[in-house]
Swiss-Prot record:
InterPro entries: Ribosomal_bL9 (IPR000244), Ribosomal_bL9/RNase_H1_N (IPR009027), Ribosomal_bL9_bac/chp (IPR020594), Ribosomal_bL9_C (IPR020069), Ribosomal_bL9_C_sf (IPR036791), Ribosomal_bL9_N (IPR020070), Ribosomal_bL9_N_sf (IPR036935). The keyword Cell membrane does not apply. HAMAP family: Ribosomal_bL9. SUPFAM superfamilies: L9 N-domain-like, Ribosomal protein L9 C-domain. GO terms for cellular component: ribonucleoprotein complex; ribosome. Keywords: Ribonucleoprotein, Ribosomal protein, RNA-binding, rRNA-binding. This is Large ribosomal subunit protein bL9. It comes from the Bacteria. One of its GO terms (biological process) is translation. Belongs to the bacterial ribosomal protein bL9 family.
């Protein structure tokens, strides 16, 4: 089925592009969520009239993505996580956690634009995570997972008091 995209869609096309997708994907996802419209003569005429505005909007998005990339390249996220005695994390870090931390820093990034090369981060260490901002423009941020310090010294002092 041919549809016209109403907004940029990763791995599919840009706003105003006519793309051929499977019928189920169009009927069950793209059309109900408003990401696309049917490709018929009427809609093609409407989008051809809007083409200049679409191109201007795409150029604005590209400029904003370049500015955002410059800011994001300086970002280092740090997660302090709990683990068991063998060093395994109780909770892994996924794209939602990273998007939430970026939001706290003032960056509104959609979760689907965060590319986790390694899948969810399940061990302590430093990782590079790619954020796809716009076609051909992406930023790499550093995510560091550190161990939360346990309060063993507090437990030891309590046990000494009980013995006395």
């Amino acid at each position: 089925m041919k549809v016209i995209l109403r907004e940029d869609f990763i791995n599919l096309g840009k706003e105003g592009d006519i793309v051929d997708v499977k019928d189920g994907f169009a009927r069950n996802y793209l059309l109900p969520k408003g990401f696309a419209v049917f490709s018929n003569k009427h809609n093609i005429d409407i989008f051809s009239q809007k083409k200049r505005a679409i191109l201007k909007r795409q150029e604005t998005r590209r400029k904003m993505a370049v500015e955002l990339k410059e800011k994001l390249d300086k970002v280092n996220l740090e997660f302090i996580m709990q683990s068991n005695d063998s060093g395994k994390l109780f909770h892994s870090i996924n794209s939602s956690n990273i998007a939430d931390e970026l939001l706290k820093l003032g960056f509104e990034i959609e979760r689907r634009k965060i590319d986790m090369h390694h899948g969810a981060l399940k061990a302590f260490g430093t990782y590079n995570v790619t954020i796809k901002l716009y076609e051909g423009i992406s930023s790499v941020i550093t995510v560091e997972i550190k161990r939360e310090e346990k309060k063993n010294s507090l437990k030891k002092s309590k046990s000494v008091e009980k013995e006395v």
